[in-house]
Amino acid sequence: MPMEDMLEMLKSCCRRGLERLYPAGVPPAAMRRYRHELELVERAGTAEEYLLFREISKAAERAFSKIYVPNSVQGTMLVYLLGDHDLNPLSAHYYCTACGYYTEPKGAAVGLDLPPADCPHCGKPLRRDGFSLRRQWSDSAVEMGAFSYWFSNGFYPTGCRVIEQHYRKRGRRAVPSACWRDSADRYESHGMVVLPRGRTMDTMPETLKIRDEFGGLCIDVTDLDKVPVPLSLRRTELLDRMEALQRESGILFSELPVILSTRTLLQDMLATDIPDKEQRALLRRQKPATIGAIMDCLTACCNLYERPGGGNIRHDSLYEKLQWDEQFARSFAEYPVYSREALYALLRREGCCRERAFELTESIRRGWWCFDPEQREQWLPKKLLWQCARIVYLSGRAPGCWRGLQYLRMAQYLHLVPQTFYRVMWGV
């Protein structure tokens, strides 16, 4: 299919998504974000990747399953419109589905933290939405269109078939791939790889053919420079557990009630024992009072910090840093930088212009903080210097927001059907 036709198809799908999500009129903020991202896709020629995402998302919806896209593309308007209706990237806002009223109140990063309200024009209950996912960190991902997918074990074969059929219609083959894992001392399934037009598994060089942990014939993608277009696919236990709860309880994800009180949800979420040790420890330590704060804590658990004297191999998680580094703990207590968005906002409050704040945030969050002390002290509070000088990687908010939503869903299952939850999770 010519690129122009794929782009028109993408526009058509997005327009239907906008009409479905905003039935009383599309807010200007949503239209601006959509048009901006569409221009990036048109310039980069990556429309096909978004159409494939839509096909996979629709297949998951038909199977009453969910998928997760773990990189920065998760926080884009295009992904939200094309099938993943979890993370609206706009600022926290109210929207009236009856008359189209739209407003972005101050003081909340996540729309679910806004108090219930009625439309001042027509009196109908307002929809609360938005996760404040800045486009500064998603623009490059939009242009690359580099999707990775997390599936449940049950949906994994279906997802692979959708990918295979998508490329077969375009005269190309998508075949299984595997990657060498030093930690396991073996090849492990990596997902799929899209072969050049006219090539099949039989015509690929024998040096690239290996067997994965299941014994299946795969293309070796350990050296990405030697193979074309790998698609990273991963199985995740979290989605397996969610599907089991949905199946055993008879309550679909889409049928779960409106979010309950934050206090109840946090207690139930910790009681599920689904968050890992570090996530539970940080949640108990910080005692988040809002849904947005819960999500920020989960985002912070994705961050990496340098261990002084440990070389480039050994990195600490936030939990580990807080355990042994007293100076870091004091800095974090006063300036709890959970995510790149949080650091960007702090720099803006300290007087940085937008361009300078983004430049510094990118340098710090990638572990490239190599400015001299005088330069650092010019832009950062002194108690933040220790913290920022040792950041190896600082995550965006999207992963924590997505994971937080799934944990909150599971907490609602525990709250609504506790016996089913205990039976599915722990067999009791």
Label every model-predicted segment.
Residues 1-428:
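Noncatalytic, beta-rich nucleic-acid-contacting surfaces in large DNA/RNA-processing enzymes
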